[in-house]
Regions:
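Amphipathic alpha-helical interface elements
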Residues: 1-162
Length: 162
């Protein structure tokens, strides 16, 4: 497996978890208030995210990307706690996912080190379980984790002579 495949596989997992998060939020947010779309969704977005949502006439959570969905979950956390049991550790996982998403959305030409990749995969797995992704997603994450854990799975690039 080459570097491009690793980046591609992790981004595919992030895309899948975005769908799971949209479904999870769809189960909770409408119970918070009748005006949940304005109060919990649109008001949670950054200026640019809200502008995109309005310009493209977003009308459902699945219209949003992972960054926006994570922001909605984080900013609406206390509102959601009024209708669902949501431990603080799960909010911490949402915040960890924001970092993971940023790591891979802004991945440099160099692949992150093995420990970073494994940490990110562990967070993705924990998050996927939290938002009730299908078990097939857990298997994909576990398979990629097992591959990355193998010695020599990620070749360290040679040092350049200065």
């Amino acid at each position: 497996m080459d570097r491009t495949t690793i980046v591609s596989d992790i981004n595919a997992l992030l895309h899948i978890t975005a769908g799971c998060l949209a479904n999870w939020l769809d189960e909770i947010l409408p119970r918070v208030t009748d005006s949940w779309w304005e109060d919990c969704v649109l008001s949670s977005l950054s200026y640019s995210q809200r502008e995109v949502a309005e310009n493209r006439n977003f009308s459902k959570l699945s219209d949003f990307d992972l960054a926006a969905l994570l922001r909605i979950a984080d900013k609406s956390w206390y509102d959601m706690r009024t209708v669902a049991y949501l431990p603080t550790s799960e909010r911490e996982c949402v915040r960890d996912m924001i970092s993971v998403r940023n790591n891979w959305a802004h991945c440099s030409a160099e692949l992150p080190d093995k420990d970073t990749i494994l940490r990110d995969l562990n967070i993705i797995l924990k998050f996927a379980q939290q938002v009730n992704c299908e078990h097939a997603v857990y298997s994909k994450i576990s398979e990629l984790t097992a591959f990355i854990e193998k010695p020599g799975s990620i070749a360290v690039p040679p040092q350049r002579a200065e």
